[in-house]
A protein has these predicted regions:
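Catalytic binding pocket for nucleotide-activated donors in carbohydrate/polymer assembly enzymes
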Residues: 1-146, 150-155, 160, 164-177
């Protein structure tokens, strides 16, 4: 495949259901992703074993937004892992000193607001990546999983979509069969 892993980390409830993840899956890439958009359909098609799920569900996010209960600073305070990542944004680890302010802005936004709940999903995202990495190292099993992915994802093919649109939406028949 063109890629072995497809990372689809949109916040649940915020993805407009793009097709990039389908293209990766059609080519055998296994998905590390949230329960959002087309990821849901892909996971149903390929099976739980071929999908590395992580993150909050749409209902949880909506509830936390509605009652203003998400406090990103509390997530930061509870996790040494997240502290290390966040504190690296506040250093010059990623850029020259004159650009540190750009990363500081990201740091402050994530700790004060984090509308998309990045910090809430971050530790689970890391765990999902580690599971995928572990599985990837078993090359024979990974190859089998990639083949299963291709075999199970056919309903997302453009041929099937065009035939279904022709029949159900455009109400036209093929010129020749």
């Amino acid at each position: 495949p063109a890629a072995d892993i497809s990372i689809q980390n949109s916040t649940a409830g915020f993805e407009a259901s793009g097709t990039g993840n389908m293209k990766f899956a059609l080519n055998g890439a296994l998905t590390v992703g949230t329960y959002d958009g087309a990821n849901i359909e892909i996971r149903e098609a390929v099976g739980e074993d071929n999908f590395y799920l992580f993150g909050l569900r749409e209902e949880q996010i909506a509830e936390m937004h509605a009652n203003n209960s998400y406090k990103p600073h509390e997530v930061y305070d509870r996790s040494d892992y997240i502290k290390r990542i966040m504190n690296s944004l506040n250093s010059n680890m990623f850029c020259e000193k004159e650009y540190v302010l750009l990363f500081k802005m990201i740091y402050e936004e994530l700790l004060s607001r984090d509308y998309y709940m990045v910090l809430a999903d971050l530790a689970e995202f890391n765990q999902a990546l580690h599971r995928a990495e572990h599985d990837y190292l078993n090359r024979e099993e990974w190859a089998k999983a990639a083949i299963r992915n291709v075999a199970r994802i056919g309903r997302f093919s453009s041929d099937r979509a065009v035939m279904e649109y022709a029949d159900k939406i455009w109400h036209i028949k093929p010129v020749a069969e």
